[in-house]
Every structure is written in structure tokens, then in C-alpha cells.
Amino acid sequence: MTRHVYLCPLRWSDMDAYGHVNNVQFLRLLEEARVAMLFVEPKTADVMTLDGQLVVVRHEIEYTAPLVYRPEPIAIETWVTRIGGASFTVAYEVKDGEQVYARARTVLAAIDKESGRARRLAADERSWIDAYHEPEISA
């Protein structure tokens, strides 16, 4: 299992009237980390990617502590917990050392560019995604 770590800078505009990062902004931070793992960094390493053929099916976020603005980037660990026939689940932890600010999951589905319909993940895509696979532990 390999977790991707994205160091995400916070922006002043991420904060809300309560002085912490707004819940909606967390989705944007998670998107940045997910895009870095799936599309940006693999291309610089000349590795096959899904070429943008994904849609978000569902997001789930658990906020565990308020995150206030700071000049240092926040670490977002990203990995894959489930690989299905046409979809997979990406998990995240927004953290600083042992302090976890949020845990989240996103279900993504592969789509056909021409038809816009769901399609099965190809063997090479599954193999590439599997490099980040860490099965969830059931309680």
C-alpha cells in the first residue's frame, strides 16, 4: 500500500466567518489532492493515467477538528480503498502529524468519453490504481 501525500497550501479565502476552513472548501482541497494523485504527478513520471475519464459519484466527509489558516501547507494523504468493475473509492486524511482535521471518501466512476456512460476499468487502469490500494478495515 502506498499513500499519496499532497502538501496543500491554504488560502485566506478558504476561511469562513467562524475563522476556520469552510466545509465547502474542504471539497476543493480534497479535489486538489485527488487530481495530483490521479492526473498530475503520474504524468510527470510517465505513468498511465485515467486521462480525465472520471466522474464523482459520491463524497462523504467527517470533520474531526477545526482547521484554521496557516502559512504552512497542510498534508492530505490519499489512497484507494475499493476497486470495483467501473468505479473505485478514494480515501483521504487531512492532517498535520497526528492531528487529523478531516477524513473523507470519494467514489469515482470511469466513463466513456464519447457516450458519457459508465464503462469498466481496463486491466492497465486497475493495475495502476492498485498501486495506491489499501483495503478498509471493518470494525
Give a label for each model feature.
Residues 1-75, 81-139:
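Terminal targeting signals and extreme-terminal segments of soluble enzymes
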